[in-house]
Structures are given as C-alpha cells and as structure tokens.
C-alpha cells in the first residue's frame, strides 16, 4: 500500500475510518495493521511495508514520546529504512479532563478530520 497505518488498541477502529477517508480523498492505497501490542513490534512486517510505502502512520491512545510510534521509528532506523513516519497520539504533557473522549481528542489534534489533515499534509 502507498500508506500503511499501524494502530494500537482503541485506535484500530479510528485507523480503519482514516484509511477509508484517505483512500477516497487521495486515490492512494491504504493498509491497516492491528499491531495488537506495542512490544515486541513486528519488525519484519514493519520494515517490509515501509520499504514499499510512501508513508507509515502510527496511531496510539498514549503519549507518542517513548510510545508505540517511537518504537516504530527506532525499528526502521535500526534497519536503515528512511520512510517518513507520522506518529498520532497524545502529546508529551499533561492532558486535561473533558466530558467525553471526542472532545479531548479534538483538543489535541486527534479528531478524525484532524488526523486526516495531518496525514494528507505529510504526503505533500
């Protein structure tokens, strides 16, 4: 696929929705991997996909710093793969409270439309 989405946990359904929107709006092929767990990462599959993809996107319901996306970056760097990565997740700072997760995600760039815009910008 042109773009590979690697999602963890509660972000898997979000990744499928993002893949559908991204493919419809860009005409690119978009794949989704349910990573199931952060460690150990499936390095063989990640490296294989990254070598043929234009972009890798990780989606996690946790801090991106030191999280699943960082593990993906380290894995690719260790294999000499330079495919760009977009890490979608929570910022490395205190995240306030909200009445619902949709509001909280929107406040931190993680609404469906915001994630789509972030990925599309990375493809330019």
Across the structure, where does each feature detected by a protein language model lie?
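Thiamine diphosphate
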Residues: 1-124
């Amino acid at each position: 696929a042109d773009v590979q989405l690697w999602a963890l946990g509660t972000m898997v359904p979000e990744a499928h929705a993002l893949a559908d929107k991204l493919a419809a709006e860009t005409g690119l092929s978009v794949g989704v991997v349910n990573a199931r767990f952060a460690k150990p990462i499936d390095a063989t599959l990640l490296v294989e996909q990254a070598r043929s993809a234009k972009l890798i996107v990780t989606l996690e319901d946790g801090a991106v710093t030191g999280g699943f996306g960082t593990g993906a970056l380290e894995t690719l760097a260790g294999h000499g793969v330079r495919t760009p990565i977009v890490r979608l997740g929570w910022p490395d700072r205190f995240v306030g409270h909200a009445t619902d997760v949709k509001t909280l995600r929107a406040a931190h760039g993680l609404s469906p439309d915001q994630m789509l815009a972030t990925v599309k910008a990375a493809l330019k």
